[in-house]
Amino acid sequence: MKSVRWLFALTLLVGAGLPANAPAADKIGVVVLHGKWGSPDGHTRGLAKQLESNGFLVTSPEMPWSRQREYDKGAAAFVAEIDAAVTELRAKGAKKIAVVGHSQGAVAALRYATQRPVDGAALIAAGGHPQNDRFRDNYSSAVAEARALVGQGKADAPVSFNDLNGDRNRNLRAPAQSVLDYFDPDGPLNSYVNAARVRPGTAVLLIAPTQEAKSLKELSHSTYEKLAPAAKSSQVEVDADHVKAPDAAKMAVTDWLRGL
């Protein structure tokens, strides 16, 4: 089984010395995925800039869960959008690919690691777990409506719902398929299911902020425990809250990438 290693902010990963045959940073492509209601210029911007300054090839696309897009596309579409980002990095010379996500982006990165071969997936303060009880209660009526519409062949029909983001919420409307994909406990973003389906040999780094809400800490830990035994998994703690976790994780992510 996997080895669990808890470290603190700005410390090096245990045993993460750079192997003699490790690729140069400019041969590692990194897709950085922002969190819910975020954007590439939000909480993940500093991390993306730090990785670029260390020589990594980095792209940070705006994803369907951004504040502007409001879940305009579902899971299959966001996988395709990450595919496009990977193609861009490959064209620039990337030989290895890692997906680094924050919050909702972390859960999406985990999903991507079940759908495509990647060298690594880093999950920073993973959030947006549709299988958690709070989400089940909040989104159940919208999920039921969306399921009925999709069953009628109306996947693009809009569904209204109250969207949760920590202690904040917004009233939104999104296509039925998107509502199912993001909020159905049995849908494609169930992090427990995806953890068990990560492709063998994929490096998975879980970054847990010490000031995270208790419920999210428990969900992240449970997700980590369900990772496929063949995944190369590791954990790091950073001294930060949920939104500041990407900045606090800069050193840990940089060192982990160098060890791919």
PLM feature spans:
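Gly/Ala-rich beta-loop-alpha elbow adjacent to hydrolase catalytic centers
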Residues: 100-109
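Short beta-strand element of the alpha/beta-hydrolase
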Residues: 27-35
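Residue in the alpha/beta-hydrolase core beta-strand immediately N-terminal to the catalytic nucleophile
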Residues: 98, 120-122
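Conserved alpha/beta-hydrolase
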Residues: 51-68
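Accessory cap/linker subdomain of secreted extracellular hydrolases
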Residues: 124-194
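Alpha/beta-hydrolase active-site loop
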Residues: 72-92
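The serine-hydrolase catalytic nucleophile loop
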Residues: 37-47, 218-219
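Serine-hydrolase catalytic core
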Residues: 165-249
